[in-house]
Each structure stands twice: as C-alpha cells, then as structure tokens.
C-alpha cells in the first residue's frame, strides 16, 4: 500500500518473484490530512478506488484474492501498470498537494498573517486543506515520484506562464475560456 509504485516494483518485484512470493501493489485512493488513531474512520475506504499494480504478472487467482480483500473493505478496484499509476497520481494527487502548499506559502510570504486569517474563507480552506498532511511523508512521496511529478510540474508552470501572459495583456476572454474549461 503506498502512493508510488514504480520504485517499489523495481526494487522488490523481481526479487520476491524469484523467491516465490507474490507481490501486487495496492493503492487505495482514500485518506485524510489528519494523522493518528483518534482520526481513524471505519468508512475510509467506502466507495474508494483501489489501484492494483501487477507488473510481475502474479497469477490471476492471487490477484483476485487481493481484489476481494479491497472490495470487502469498501473499495472498487482497477488495474494498471506501475508507471501508469505513478503518472496518474502525480496528476490528481501529488501536484495538487504541492500546489496546495504553494497557495499557503504564497498567502503567508510577506503578508499580514493576522489579517489574512480574518479574511480567508472557504475557498482558501478548501484549496489548502491537503497541505496539512504529514510533511515528511509528502516529501518522500514527491521525491520518490519525481520523474512524473516533474513532468506534471512543468505542465503546470507552462499554464501558469500562460495565465500570467493573459493577465499582463488584460485578456479577460482568454482567462474566462481557461477558467470555463476547468
């Protein structure tokens, strides 16, 4: 179970297979920015997607056992290659986490934190909630998935550059279309 699969499959997949141990990666797409037993939830996996990565081609019977486990705790399962998993989660989890932290840093760097606390509302809270996740864990996730994260980050920087150009040019229509497409 974990947020990055490629490095795990590379490091242990073939070794375990040679030793006769079945290895299938699992990543339930569920979680919270909160840590500790006091924040445990019996509903955490309800209706969540669990990604199974079977790059070592473990026999279908074993894969189905693992799939049934995840289904019994409430997940529905999909299968994909580790590289596809890492690329996908970079887009929908890792980059959003980094951008959430960026929003916090951008708001606080040089700003009046007391005033900002008074005027911030739901949009800021919703955008920055995930940045409250455990920093050491997230640093590890981002670093382990660096190739996919860097590719997505370059795409995000390119789009931010375009937004900056539209703002500098006063191009409200381009901004409107970009926001509408989101």
Features from the language model and the residues they span:
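Conserved strand-to-helix beginnings and helix N-cap segments that scaffold or border functional pockets
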Residues: 9, 35, 60-64, 153
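Rossmann-like NAD(P)(H) cofactor-binding subdomain of soluble oxidoreductases
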Residues: 1-38
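Internal alpha-helical scaffold of NAD(P)-dependent oxidoreductase catalytic cores
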Residues: 42-132
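Short, flexible, solvent-exposed loop/turn segments with mixed acidic/basic and small polar residues
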Residues: 38-44, 139-140
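Interdomain hinge/lid region at the active-site interface
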Residues: 113-182
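Residue-level detector of flexible, active-site-proximal loop/helix-junction positions
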Residues: 5, 30-33, 57, 84, ...
């Amino acid at each position: 179970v974990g947020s990055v699969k490629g490095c795990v499959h590379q490091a242990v997949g073939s070794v375990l297979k040679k030793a006769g141990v079945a290895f299938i990666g699992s990543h339930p797409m569920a979680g919270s920015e909160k840590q500790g037993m006091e924040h445990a939830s019996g509903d955490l996996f309800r209706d969540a997607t669990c990604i199974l990565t079977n790059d070592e081609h473990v026999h279908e019977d074993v894969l189905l056992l693992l799939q049934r486990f995840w289904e019994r705790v409430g997940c529905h399962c999909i299968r994909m290659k580790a590289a596809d998993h890492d690329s996908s989660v970079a887009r929908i989890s890792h980059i959003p986490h980094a951008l959430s932290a960026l929003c916090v840093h951008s708001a606080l760097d040089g700003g009046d934190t007391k005033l900002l606390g008074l005027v911030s509302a739901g949009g800021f809270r919703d955008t920055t909630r995930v940045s409250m996740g455990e920093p050491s864990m997230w640093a590890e996730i981002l670093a382990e998935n660096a190739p996919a994260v860097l590719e997505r980050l370059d795409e995000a920087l390119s789009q931010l550059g375009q937004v900056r150009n539209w703002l500098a040019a006063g191009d409200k229509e381009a901004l409107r279309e970009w926001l509408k497409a989101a």
